[in-house]
Amino acid sequence: MANELARMRPAAVPPATGSVDQALAHAARLMARQPAAALAQAREILHAVPGHPHALLIEGQALRMLGRLDEACAVLRGLVASQPRAAAAAAELGLTMAAMDRSEEAVAELRRAVLLKPEFSHAWQALAVLLRAKGDNAGAAHADIAGVDASSREPALLRTAVAVREGRLDEAEAQLRARLAALPADPATLRLLGEVRWRQGDIGDAVPLLRAAVARAPAFAAARELLARILSMGPDVGEALDHASRLLADDPENGGHAMLKASLLVRIGDQKGALAIYRSILERDPGRPRVWLNLGHVEKTIGNQAAAIEAYRRAAALDPANGEAWWSLANLKTVKLERADIAAMRAALPHDAVGDDRAEDVAQLHFALGKAYEDLSRDDPSAAESAFAHYARGNALRRSMLDYDPARTDSAVDQNIALFTPEFFEARAGWGCQAADPIFVVGLPRSGSTLVEQILASHSQIEGTMELPDMMLIADRLQARVDEGEFPDLPSLLAALGPDECRRLGEEYLERTRVHRKTDRPRFVDKMPNNWQHVGLIRMILPNATVIDARRHPLGCCFSGWKQYFARGQVFSYDLSEIGHYYAAYVRQMAAFDSALPGAVHRVIYEEMVADTLGQVRALLDAVGVPFEENCLAFWRNRRAVRTASSEQVRQPIYTDALEQWKRFELWLGPLRAALGPLLERYPEPV
């Protein structure tokens, strides 16, 4: 509004123009925090220069902010009459009318303001609020967008946007915070500052800023979309889905909004809803490989293998260098790639150094080629060397992208072993949330955990969900308190938790996971293998939960994990020595937990499950505390959605083929054997 004020001139200007301008600027600065002082300053100027329009505007605004609305209205009506081309005067009169609940007059004045000055963002924003209150959602949406567009075109904000694009985030943050101090409700500023804080790694600060932007301008799609995407990275998936649904309702033909909503439906387990969206997009535009790929993922999850294969092949045909499409096809496990597929993948490999923009695609191409040659090696043992070579290249490339230090795992295990003693748990008997709903399945990836989950989910009292991140998110939040200096280390924090906080954390976990529960079954499975690191925390906050440790022969488990390209996480798995070291750390911690709380964890040995399925299933159900049901032996008939790498394998009866796959590659597994050490001789003993 300051630039608009500068255009307003009095009929006669006294000689001391500079001093008047300085006084006006001082009055404007006082307005936000001291409107009474601003009013006094404006009236001093008007005493010296009667009728000065800038001073009259400040007087009217100050009177409005002080709640003296009739006086403000009288001043501003006179100003508008004398300055009919002054957008700032019309806007201020509109705001005053709005404060007096005279909405029709307020809308008329604000419309006049933006007609006089289309780039008047503040007036557009005020108009949007009034129109929305009147039920004119279309008009409000237009005003939202016009206001954001006007604000975004201001030179200062454009310069800040350039700083953001160039990665000068601290500089941009300082500029945006200064701007926000002057314009605390400006949606464009709020959105850009939210983006900066997100890119700086502070999601906790970014989300409120973006929520404020959306609250101020509900039709601001860019702010709502960024908010939804950031929320989707954490536990607030339900809110993210609400925003995505609003985006798609406002713009039904927007493919990006449709993709966002579909991805969130997948997150909450609504595979059919996601399927409908992907198919709808492809009906309109079948030439989109990314959509075919996502469709394949959903078809695979719900067990439509033929449809998944077709979708993955369509994605690969449209984009032959798309490593994710080829790996997704290979990762079906039950599909064998043909020699023509091998030729197509080899042709897609780069002939020179791999750039960062292609690294993931190339890594996945190598993993897919490894799987293709491994399948050939069943009939042609010489293909094993090519398979291992491609797996090794893919792993090396993937490992180069990741930050993982095995020493951190060892340190965490040492701390857990020292903290979680029999005395520790005895002193906390009866603490935590007493609900017995969750069944945690822990272990390493590729250990048979999906098989255990599928068996349990075939029981009439147990619901299968997915790999839930919620316990890890709770642990991460506790770790953040350590990182902020509240405690010297995580064991100190855990030891300091009292009974009420333990109970609240357990209740929080149940509340977080509620979105994934689609039935009224009393128990549910949380199959997140890496929760073995948090078994002590689980016992503290949910002492009646069941913990199942799914374990497989170390060579079979680790080699299978090493040749798996994971969509996210599992950073320890891309080096044979590191995955062996990780397995040993896991065994060491679980053995210590067995000693601290004998019988608290039920262990399922994969090889024993294969050899004696009936006996092992009975023991598993006994550990969970539910009666035996025949359905659990026919788990492959369960059509529930399964999102893990073993999704196709658990849709068939137990088979023995996977038990010794590693033996064809034994020649190259020296680093893994060395890392595992004496565990190889002791398996399946827990220590």
Predicted feature descriptions by range:
Residues 32, 65, 99, 133, ...:
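Register position in tetratricopeptide repeats
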Residues 48, 82, 116, 148-150, ...:
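Structural marker of alpha-solenoid helical repeat scaffolds
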Residues 302, 307, 314-316, 465, ...:
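PAPS-dependent sulfotransferase catalytic domain
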